[in-house]
Swiss-Prot record:
Its main location: membrane. This is Probable serine/threonine-protein kinase gdt9. It catalyses: L-seryl-[protein] + ATP = O-phospho-L-seryl-[protein] + ADP + H(+); L-threonyl-[protein] + ATP = O-phospho-L-threonyl-[protein] + ADP + H(+). Residues 1290-1573 form the Protein kinase domain. The lineage of its organism: Eukaryota, Amoebozoa, Evosea, Eumycetozoa, Dictyostelia. Residues 17-966 are extracellular.
Length: 1577
């Protein structure tokens, strides 16, 4: 016996279970350290706290175990079990079942399950005192049960019972049908149910319990009648007022007549889930459970023996034990609550509480008189709440929370959360004082007992993150409904430790105790009235998107930053800044973009100034709500602070979009835009610019106003535009008033210094090239511990004491080229904080009394997790915050600011991020040439050399006195339109009959070049642009000089990549400048005409000029200003023409195509290789790859310059014959026919633009007239991937289908099997084709056909999609007997089955099982669900437009929706769709009657499709005259053939989906289909 006890104790110790003895009147206890046994992330507490231990009563001792092999749960299966109040134990491996219609009664007192027990439908409600599910146990019930007090048992000191305690395994409580119904009010006592029910299921014995805004805790009404399965009439209660819109009805008799769990005991029961239990509760009524009241927690206290920590000598029973809620879940991540009705009767703490769990809540109705509807304790890092309705009667006496006792959630909250991630979608909150209450725990690590209190998932540092971090907070609240019906009472107040709710009701209350730095909260698609957001985020950010706020909405509390996007307010939100903490006044930085603010008629809006540079407030003021229904502001330019050079022109633009087609829509004949300036006469600022009022007529075609603005003085302009009806007689009547962001006008700036980041490797270590997806990292600590020249961060970036860098720096190389352009390889290395949220500080020496322009280039690599990554920038310790939306993919950002340095020797720039945003480089510009104070050139050179060994960076000193320097960093807020230099018209074929005197043959050898590598970087230098900067402080960088643009241009720079590869020469230098001669403006942005025939100019600086410059260098250096640098007006980056780091290896010439026209022109001349030494002409490059180190951008113009040299003493004429423009690309040159003198070198520039995804391998003919020689220059360009395809890359196979539109082919594109829909150009509706291309290009979903691309040209019009091996659903179910074609008036464009390897042929119909049909229907519904979420109505849903990919019902994907030619995108302001499109037998009433329709038209079509698939008959086949179908559908008639033979649930779903009114959404349809499928499966 002693041996057995020893083994048992060892097993318990191994499992972490400790047995605790108690006084004899109590159950003995078991103790588990919940964090060690339940938290499976490999992290152990650093501090052992009492709440880490989990105690529970050992009620399973002395229970009766089942007889081995017994399967029926009856008395005889348990030896010597009593008839009533038995204490039973189902052993491990035993599987027992209660028989249907079995009456258990009071058979069970205590039931412990280590095996499994299943209670099927039909078992009479039974009683139970304690249900314990042990690890590995499984309890499943589809019938009701009641809790009762334990009989003849010891006392449970921890108050778990009566109730359920799970320690692992699974708990499934599943009801067979819905128990609650949503309803719309028809009258005080009449309602329309949103779900069809059987009227015969109810009689006068039933009661209808109604819950609404006026009856939060419900009222019971008499059941009168149900007509048509939808219309409910009640009586014997108060009428529901018309103001109530959220109405739910619960039918019940005395015995409920539904699946329920309630308590018949003297005290309520509770359900306690622990130990990673799998929980699924659905369609159950949890009634009057929950023991924990809303009073302060008073837990049971165990008094241990001083000499034995396993012996409890006394117990003080707690009066309010925590966590005894209706449902408490801890350490369980697979928890689903769906379509339940949870009602509590006492004033409880909360019916639902979660601790270190991630629950999914869907479609539940939660009614309570409690402190909170749901409480998420710490560790519950994700709550997914969808379509739930939370009704709450706030407590009359909320208690003061106790931080030390973890006592929270008493205020009357909807959701009370101590965790950072909250996701609510279309939830309803009724009656709560605070709908969402988020509270940070002060000193959270100490409370939880972890060094790093990680928000799930908690994981070690990756190459990007060097340590464990706390994730940012992300609140995603999408389309919720909030209703507060208690009025402005004062009986309920918030008594949080740091905030007091004096407004009675808040949408959101956020309490930041200072433990979490710099958090970003986001809200989306709110619609609220008389609500308030209260926040205490002195170092946090709140982002609000798509908010519609009426009445007196406001935001109160303290914020560091507020972002408002795409929202509508009745008044400007009165941001309250008077909330102080420790007596410190806290300020708010606000950005407001694309948002509407109501201003009453007669009131003039006051311009809201941005608090700091970078924040933008540009509301659209309106004084009539009907204006929003007429037209809205689509975009404005500029939309953020903008800078322009003096005397240059900027096009101020307002684009509108109409939102209705009524006759009240303003016409362009009477809408004008009045542009004026706002000057504050009281302001002390002397450089505010004033302009006279200018009226601009609205463009009738483009729907915009464009105001060309040119200012000839420096200063700031505050511009206001009033959009109004010029014929209006009311002085104060207008449509919109817009205050543009401040525009700054200044003189030309020039390049000053540049910094980039490169790695410093030890001389003893070899560098490895890493993948762009796996960046290498070198932390500060690692560098500091190494030797030799690798301690790059030791000295910061010191260069002549001009630059220092803080220690909190981690260097990462091989960042991805997020712009898909090799021109940005400068930005592929960067620095980020070692410690997240701790600043990286850079201190730069600058000259006094000058104005500087700074550019910071950041690369966002990849998300650390699914949460946001905000970026904060500080200048001289002052915040420089920009509106920075969430980023979920690699991206690139450029931030520009100006700094007037009056009397400082340096500037401090710092930034804060989570560790996934990298500062990759920085550029500094000034109005005047700036030089550092330094000694002679030798010492400067010495310092530079020294710094490259130990410092991180090198600052470029720019003191050249004879060469002009401009770095073309082209960045603008609107992405600058493309420069395209068009090819010359018709190529002239020049034939020279002069006899060649020196004939030689060329050899097919690989081309070579004498060009030396000018891209080598100094391996020991941390910060640099290129090594040319470092060679001589008095020498201008040649590469930057060659990138110079024409300084005389007053336009912002075009996005043209310009690369020069001309070799240097002792006597000559070449400065190329390609500037467009003709330009136009579109929408306020620069757009260069593609039809311009003007040539670009090439300026050639002679040696004479160079000599003059050299003779006067010392005198001109300090006097001459550098060329004007194009301004960087905002945060959006276009291409930057920088030097390339490397080139792709050359390929043999034979893969290049030669145009036939070129061959004809050159057929009579002799061919020579371009590098043949016998010909007098020498090319610096014979293969033009335009400097592409990677694939190029489509529609981007790239310019490449080479040099041609005449080695002989004879002049020659050269003719360049270019490939003819085609649909793939356009190439041109600045000089097609030219003379080259003896010994002369001449630059030639080529420009190319690719129009689609293609590989452009062409040859340019070069003819030497006098010698009758010719050669070729090869063009090698490959574009990035896009949806615009090259027709020549499509391989056509057999025809799959055809119609009047054209044909569908099976084919290949780049070895991928695809379907090619080839249109007959000129015979199809181009609008439908373009609409289909546009929609398919926007959407990606597994149940929507994948769009590969398209071909659009004068000759070809194709849509390329993925290929379906089986074919359409119509052909699958009907085969060759597809009769429905006779019922349609449209031609199907289905891709039919042509794959001989498939097991299913579409030549004949295939008999599908019910499971297969349901699986296909689920995929169709999921596809439609996604389309509707994207705002797309398909409008032609039918079997022929559903492609089948697999008929195995267990396959990942079985079906996909196709054919979007008739689809339509919608928006929330305009849903008046009346076009009659689609196929008649699938058209809803609204379409047939040409009435307004919405998403429900697809629901109706789905119902007909689903019906057709289930019965395998053509719909309406019982009607002989097909022309009668529309009138019958309009009258309410629906197909009946075979409908009654279907499964009841399937039949009901079809009836609901094609009902005349109140059709379900596809969210509900998917849910219903999945439930039906599971039943069949």
């Amino acid at each position: 016996m002693k041996t057995f006890l020893l083994i048992f104790l060892l097993i318990c110790v191994c499992k972490g279970i400790t047995n605790i003895t108690t006084p004899s009147i109590y159950f003995d206890l078991k103790k588990i350290n919940r964090f060690q046994d339940y938290l499976n992330n490999g992290i152990t507490p650093s501090i052992n706290l009492t709440f880490h231990d989990f105690y529970y009563p050992d009620v399973c001792v002395n229970t009766i175990k089942n007889i081995d092999g017994s399967t029926n749960f009856v008395k005889s299966s348990f030896l010597n079990a009593p008839t009533n109040f038995a204490n039973l134990y189902i052993t491990k491996g035993s599987k027992m079942t209660v028989k249907p219609n079995q009456i258990l009664g009071a058979f069970i007192n205590i039931l412990c399950i280590e095996g499994s027990l299943e209670v099927p439908v039909g078992v009479f409600p039974f009683f139970i005192g304690a249900l314990v599910i042990l690890p590995g146990g499984n309890f499943k019930s589809e019938s009701s049960f009641r809790f009762m007090n334990l009989v003849n048992s010891k006392i449970d000191p921890l108050n778990f019972f009566p109730g359920i305690l799970t320690l692992g395994g699974s708990l499934s409580i599943l009801g067979p049908k819905s128990i609650k119904y949503s309803a719309n009010r028809l009258g005080d006592f009449q309602f329309q149910l949103l779900e069809l029910i059987d009227p015969n299921s109810f009689n006068s014995d039933y009661k209808a319990n109604i819950y609404s805004e006026s009856f939060v805790t419900g009222q019971q009404c008499d059941f009168v009648s149900i007509t048509n399965g939808y219309t409910l009439t009640v009586g014997g209660c108060q009428g529901v007022p018309s103001t109530d819109v959220n109405i739910y009805i619960f039918f019940a008799t005395v015995d409920y007549d539904c699946t329920f769990i309630d308590s018949d005991s003297e005290v309520p029961a509770s359900i306690y889930i622990s130990g990673d239990t799998n929980v699924h509760i659905e369609n159950f009524f949890l009634n009057s459970l929950g023991k924990t009241t809303n009073a302060n927690y008073n837990d049971t206290i165990l008094i241990f023996s001083p000499t034995d920590d396993t012996n409890v000598t006394d117990i003080i029973i707690g009066t309010n034990q925590r966590y005894r809620n209706s449902l408490f879940v801890e350490f369980s991540n697979n928890v689903t609550l769906r379509n339940n009705f949870i009602r509590e009767s006492i004033e409880s703490r909360s019916p639902l509480m979660f601790f270190a769990s991630s629950p999914i809540l869907e479609g539940n109705l939660v009614v309570s008189n409690s402190g909170s509807s749901v409480i998420a304790q710490f560790g519950t890092e994700f709550i997914q709440s969808t379509n739930n309705s939370y009704f709450l009667e706030p407590p009359t006496q909320p208690v003061i929370p106790n931080d030390n006792n973890m006592d929270y959630g008493t205020e009357g909250n909807g959701i009370y959360s101590l965790s950072p991630i909250v996701s609510f979608t279309t939830d309803v909150f009724v009656g709560q004082l605070i709908s969402i209450n988020f509270n940070f725990i002060a000193n959270r690590s100490l409370v939880t007992g972890f060094n790093y209190d990680c928000f799930a998932p908690c994981y070690p540092g990756s190459p990007i993150i060097s340590n464990l971090v706390q994730h940012s907070v992300d609140f995603n609240i999408i389309k919720p409904t909030f209703s507060y019906s208690h009025g402005n009472t004062t009986s309920s107040t918030t008594t949080s430790s740091t905030t007091t709710n004096t407004n009675s009701h808040f949408l959101l209350n956020v309490n930041d105790n200072g433990n979490e730095p710099s958090s970003y909260y986001s809200f989306n698609q709110l619609s609220i009235a008389s609500e308030a957001i209260k926040v205490n985020l002195p170092i946090g950010t709140l982002g609000i998107g798509n908010l519609f706020a009426t009445n007196n909405f406001k935001i109160d509390g303290a914020l560091e930053r507020l972002d408002i996007l795409n929202s509508i307010f009745n008044l400007p939100p009165p941001i309250s800044n008077n909330f102080s903490q420790s007596g410190i006044l806290l300020s708010t930085t606000t950005s407001m973009l694309n948002s509407y603010v109501f201003v009453s008629i007669g009131s003039e809006p006051t311009r809201i100034e941005s608090q700091i540079y970078g924040s933008t407030i540009t509301p659209y003021y309106y004084n009539n709500i009907e204006t929003l229904d007429l037209f809205q502001i689509q975009s404005i330019f500029p939309s953020v602070q903008y800078q322009i050079i003096k005397n240059s022109t900027i096009n101020i633009t307002i684009n509108i979009t109409t939102t209705t087609t009524t006759t009240t829509t303003p016409t362009t004949n009477n809408v004008v835009c009045s542009f004026t300036s706002i000057v504050n006469q009281q302001s002390s600022v002397t450089n505010e610019i004033s302009i006279n009022e200018t009226l601009i007529q609205m463009d009738p075609i483009l729907n915009n106003c464009v105001f060309p603005l040119s200012i000839d003085q420096e200063g700031s302009l505050k511009l206001r535009v009033t959009i109004k009806n010029q014929n209006s007689t009311l002085e104060n009547q207008y449509y919109y008033i817009i205050d543009f962001p401040e525009i700054t006008i200044f003189q030309s700036f020039q390049f000053y210094t540049g910094i980039k980041f490169i790695d410093v490797q030890s001389s003893s270590s070899s560098s490895q090239q890493t993948s762009s997806f796996s960046p290498t990292t070198t932390t500060f600590l690692n560098l500091l511990s190494t030797t030799e020249n690798s301690n790059g961060f030791l000295n910061g970036c010191q260069i002549s004491n001009q630059c220092t860098l803080s220690n909190n720096v981690k260097y990462v190389s091989s960042l991805p080229n997020v712009t898909n352009s090799p021109d940005f390889q400068l930005f592929q290395s960067g620095i980020t904080p070692i410690i997240p949220y701790d600043p990286v500080v850079i201190n730069l020496g600058i000259e006094k009394n000058k104005t500087f322009q700074f550019q910071l280039f950041f690369t966002f690599y990849q998300p650390i997790d699914q949460y946001s990554s905000p970026l904060s920038i500080f200048i001289q310790s002052e915040p420089y915050l920009l509106l920075d939306p969430l980023i979920d993919a690699p991206n690139f950002k450029n931030f520009t600011f100006f700094y007037d340095n009056l009397n400082q020797d340096s500037i401090e720039i710092s930034f804060i991020s989570r560790g996934d945003i990298y500062l990759t480089s920085m550029a500094i510009y000034s109005l005047d040439l700036v030089s550092y104070e330094s000694s002679d050139s030798s010492s400067s050179s010495s310092n530079s050399s020294s710094s490259t060994g130990n410092g991180i960076g090198d600052i470029v000193n720019n003191e050249d006195n004879h060469k002009k320097l401009v770095i073309a960093l082209s960045v603008s807020i609107p992405v600058a339109a493309l420069l395209v230099i068009l090819c010359f018209g018709i190529f002239i074929c020049y034939n020279n009959n002069k006899k060649n005197k020196n004939e030689t043959k060329g050899k097919d050898i690989e081309t070579n070049t004498d060009k030396k590598d000018d891209e080598n970087e100094n391996e020991n230098c941390k910060f640099q642009f290129k090594d040319e900067f470092l060679t001589n402080p008095n020498e201008i960088n040649i590469q930057l000089k060659k990138l110079m643009i024409n300084k005389s241009s007053t336009l912002p720079p075009q996005s043209t990549i310009s690369i020069d590869t001309s070799p240097s020469s002792e006597n000559t230098t070449f400065t190329e400048s390609l500037t467009p001669k003709k330009s136009a403006t579109v929408n306020g942005e620069i757009d260069f005409s593609r039809n311009s025939t003007n040539e670009s100019t090439v300026s050639n600086s002679s040696s004479e000029n160079n000599s003059d410059n050299n003779n006067n260098n010392n005198n001109k250096c300090k006097k001459e200003k550098l060329s004007s640098f194009p301004t960087i007006p905002g945060t959006n980056l276009t291409n930057i023409p920088l030097n390339l780091v490397g080139r792709k290896s050359r390929n043999p010439e034979d893969k290049y195509r030669t145009n036939n026209d070129i061959l004809v022109c050159l057929q009579e001349s002799h061919y020579f290789k371009p590098d043949d030494p016998s010909i007098p002409i020498e090319f610096s490059e014979s293969v033009l790859d335009f400097g592409r180190g990677s694939k190029c951008l489509i529609d981007e113009t790239y310019i490449y310059t080479i040099s041609v040299k005449n080695k002989s003493t004879t002049d020659y004429n050269i003719l360049l014959i270019l490939p003819i423009d085609n649909n793939t690309g356009t190439i041109s040159t600045d000089t097609q026919y030219f003379q080259i003198n003896a010994g002369e070198s001449k630059p030639i520039s080529f420009s190319i633009s690719l129009n689609c995804t293609t590989k452009y391998f062409e040859k340019i003919g070069v003819s030497i007239e006098e010698l009758n020689y010719h050669t070729f220059i090869c063009v090698h360009m490959e574009s990035e991937l896009s949806t615009r395809l090259d027709f020549s890359e499509l391989d056509f196979d057999e025809i799959c289908g055809q119609g009047t539109y054209g044909m569908v082919y099976k084919g290949k594109w780049r070895s991928q099997v695809v379907a090619i829909k080839m249109m007959r150009v000129g015979t199809v509706n181009c609008d439908e084709v373009y609409r289909e291309m546009d929609i398919m290009g926007k959407i990606r979903h597994q149940n929507v056909i994948s769009f590969i691309g398209c071909v659009v040209s004068l000759e070809h019009l194709c849509i390329v999609t993925e290929f379906s091996p089986i074919g359409s659903l119509g052909d699958l179910i009907h085969g060759d007997n597809n009769q429905k074609k006779s019922n349609t008036n449209t031609i199907t464009n289905t891709i039919t089955n042509t794959n001989t390897n498939t097991n299913t042929s579409t030549s004949t119909s295939t008999k599908l099982t019910v499971k297969q049909k349901l699986r296909i229907a689920i995929d169709i519904a999921r596809g439609c669900q996604f389309l509707h979420q994207c705002g797309i109505i398909h409008r032609d849903l039918k079997p022929d437009n559903v492609l089948v990919f697999d008929i195995n019902h267990n396959a990942p994907v079985c079906a996909k929706i196709s054919d979007f030619g008739t689809s339509k995108e919608t928006n929330e302001f305009s849903n008046k769709n009346t076009n009659c499109v689609g196929t008649p037998i699938y058209m809803s009433n609204e379409i047939l009657e040409k009435k307004t329709y919405d998403n429900s038209t697809d629901v109706y079509s789905f119902a007909v499709l689903f019906y057709e698939m289930m019965i395998e008959e053509v719909p309406f086949s019982e009607i002989d005259e097909k022309w009668e179908i529309p009138s019958k559908v309009i009258s309410g008639w629906r197909p009946t053939k075979g409908l009654n033979s279907l499964d009841r649930d399937i039949k009901n779903l079809i009836n609901i989906c094609w009902a005349p009114h109140s059709l379900p959404s596809f969210d509900e349809i998917v849910f219903s289909l999945v439930k039906i499928f599971k039943r069949f499966n």
